[in-house]
Amino acid sequence: MTIGVVGRKCGMTRIFTEEGVSIPVTVIEVEPNRVTQFKTEETDGYRAVQVTAGERRASRVTKAQAGHFAKANVAAGRGVWEFRLGEEQYAAGDQITVDLFQAGQMVDVTGESKGKGFAGTIKRWNFRGQDNTHGNSVSHRVPGSIGQCQTPGRVFKGKKMSGHLGAERVTVQSLEIVRVDAERNLLLVKGAVPGATGGDVIVRPAAKARG
């Protein structure tokens, strides 16, 4: 089963076991995911379910999107996401909730990492800085040489240099679900997940067996 849910990162806290052990957890709010389209091999070439979550003002929905949501008879959400399916059956208008998961289950969480803007090599690639003294004047944080001379006469592709850091899709694998709160639509996942508070995250059953 590869189907998951789309949630919103609420932040981190901690909970205590009966033995008094502190467990750091990330709270993910999973509003009911509404199915907007069910794709089949006959019509689309593969089996998948398309969902939306949250709400969006009507003035922020294009006519094409409004028609797509109206056809499925669901309220417009803040986006659409797709999950490949095995033998599961869904129909437009169905809802997928946190009941899909249970405590102790391992999941993969995908989100967009925090954007850091333009960053140097020390922040971006963990380069070590150069000497603060001993004749070094203005090169304390420079990366140093980026290649050779006439041969090969170019900088190799993939060279670690300064550039944009963050704001990219990141997946953290094999996190444990500590608690499922179906009444408040919350998932408590052990550890940290990518992205800023309030960002969208995708929670799927873990692809790899732990250990």
From Swiss-Prot:
Cellular component GO terms, alphabetical: cytosolic large ribosomal subunit
Superkingdom of the source species: Bacteria
PTM annotation: Methylated by PrmB.
Any one Gene Ontology molecular-function term assigned to this protein's record: rRNA binding
Gene3D superfamilies, alphabetized: 3.30.160.810, Translation factors
Cited Pfam families: Ribosomal_L3
Chain positions with N5-methylglutamine modification: 150
GO annotation (BP), single: translation
Entry keyword annotation includes 4Fe-4S: no
Keyword tags: Methylation, Ribonucleoprotein, Ribosomal protein, RNA-binding, rRNA-binding
SUPFAM superfamilies: Translation proteins
NCBIfam families: L3_bact
PANTHER family given in the database record: 50S RIBOSOMAL PROTEIN L3, LARGE RIBOSOMAL SUBUNIT PROTEIN UL3C
HAMAP family: Ribosomal_uL3_B
Summary of the function given for this chain in its UniProt record: One of the primary rRNA binding proteins, it binds directly near the 3'-end of the 23S rRNA, where it nucleates assembly of the 50S subunit.
Name of the molecule in the record: Large ribosomal subunit protein uL3
